[in-house]
Amino acid sequence: MKLIIGLGNPGKEYSGNRHNVGFQCLSRFAKENHISFDKKCCLSRTGSGRINDEEIVLAKPQTYMNLSGKAVNQLLRRYNLKAADIIVVQDDLDLPAGKLRLRLGGSAGGHNGVSSIITDIGTKEFIRLKIGIGKPDARNNGAEVVDHVLGNFGGEEREIIETAIARAAEALACLITSGLDTASNRFNC
């Protein structure tokens, strides 16, 4: 079984934010695979299904980004899974808008949602699918970063991200069916 967690903030006011591309990707993946987020469990909205022979659970934590680890920890215990069984879909400021990167482990890279997961589950050894949202500009400071990640995509950037979300959903399917090495070779830009 694989547990796929999309990171984001709950609520309609956040739905189009850069910080919510994890939720957006999971919604697309769920739709393409006929999975509904029809359950509330472990501080998350969840849905389950199968990809080939692999059972999967999709989860969107409803704790707000900075407390995502609480939901992930509960989900791991509920389904009796280990960190090696999870895939976290997240936004990444350090990647240009629309770029994808799959990797196992590593630091949180300043991402508070990932930091919360690492703290609450006690390891950084889980797969991440990062979707680039770009930096606000070369002069960024804390306030500009917050405004950027909580801002919505505009115009041309929205088109780039729509394409990236579609590719990220493909990357998830490849990751589940063919493994990290194959998916990384195919989708890391």
UniProtKB/Swiss-Prot annotation:
It catalyses: an N-acyl-L-alpha-aminoacyl-tRNA + H2O = an N-acyl-L-amino acid + a tRNA + H(+). The active site is at H19 (proton acceptor). InterPro entries: Pept_tRNA_hydro, Pept_tRNA_hydro_sf. The record marks N9 as: Discriminates between blocked and unblocked aminoacyl-tRNA. Its main location: cytoplasm. SUPFAM superfamilies: Peptidyl-tRNA hydrolase-like (SSF53178). It is found in: Cytoplasm. One of its GO terms (biological process) is rescue of stalled ribosome. The record marks D91 as: Stabilizes the basic form of H active site to accept a proton. TRNA binds at Y14, Y64, N66, N112. Its EC number is 3.1.1.29. It is an enzyme of class 3 (hydrolase). Keywords: Cytoplasm, Hydrolase, RNA-binding, tRNA-binding. It holds the Pfam family Pept_tRNA_hydro. GO terms for cellular component: cytoplasm. It comes from the Bacteria. GO terms for molecular function: peptidyl-tRNA hydrolase activity; tRNA binding. HAMAP family: Pept_tRNA_hydro_bact. Belongs to the PTH family. Monomer. Hydrolyzes ribosome-free peptidyl-tRNAs (with 1 or more amino acids incorporated), which drop off the ribosome during protein synthesis, or as a result of ribosome stalling. This is Peptidyl-tRNA hydrolase. It comes from Dehalococcoides mccartyi (strain ATCC BAA-2100 / JCM 16839 / KCTC 5957 / BAV1). The gene is pth.
